[in-house]
From Swiss-Prot:
It comes from Polaromonas sp. (strain JS666 / ATCC BAA-500). Nucleotide-binding protein. Coiled coil: none annotated. It comes from the Bacteria. Transmembrane segments: none annotated. Pfam families: DUF520. Belongs to the YajQ family. This is Nucleotide-binding protein Bpro_1596. GO terms for molecular function: nucleotide binding.
Length: 161
């Protein structure tokens, strides 16, 4: 039976390079001299530290430019709130999405069930496997998912005939 997987995968090497390039630019830019501005990547969390909300926004802009140049969709970023930390500093933790969350996977599954297509969706550890009798049905399901889930940079892999 033909099938495909709907996944949400980030190229972490490109993200790491973008964070390192952002850190270098922060170190050389005149408006960041003598400030607490910094950026750090740990696992799938990017931590931005600055003296003010404006500085955090500036670092975010630099990071987004670097990610876009590297070919990473910025919809992979789940931007957190800006928090005050000691000594007139602020920080923001941005999570890099990797894998479809259960809630989003259920939305995809309900979308497919509600469409009355002759395909089935099964949630499997951070991805949704869609199976159907015909290749055309699967391609229609892909189009439906792409059209409805615009806020997620979903990709489709493991297409089997």
């Amino acid at each position: 039976m033909p099938s495909f997987d709907t996944v949400l995968e980030t190229d972490m090497v490109k993200v790491k390079n973008a964070v390192e390039n952002t850190s270098k630019e922060i170190g050389t830019r005149f408006d960041f001299k003598g400030t607490a501005a910094s950026i750090e990547l740990k696992d799938k969390d990017i931590t931005l530290v600055g003296d003010s909300d404006f500085q955090i926004d500036q670092i975010n802009d630099v990071l987004r430019n670097k990610l876009t140049k590297a070919g990473v969709d910025i919809r992979f970023l789940d931007v957190g709130k800006i928090e005050k930390i000691g000594g007139d500093k602020v920080k923001q933790v941005t999570k890099v999405r990797d894998g479809i969350e259960t809630e989003q996977a259920k939305k995809i599954q309900q979308l497919i069930k509600g469409s009355k297509m002759k395909v089935q969706a099964a949630i499997q550890e951070g991805k949704v496997r869609v199976t159907g009798a015909k290749r055309d049905d699967l391609q229609a399901a892909m189009a439906l998912i792409r059209a409805d889930m615009k806020d997620l940079p979903l990709s489709f892999d493991n297409f089997r005939d």
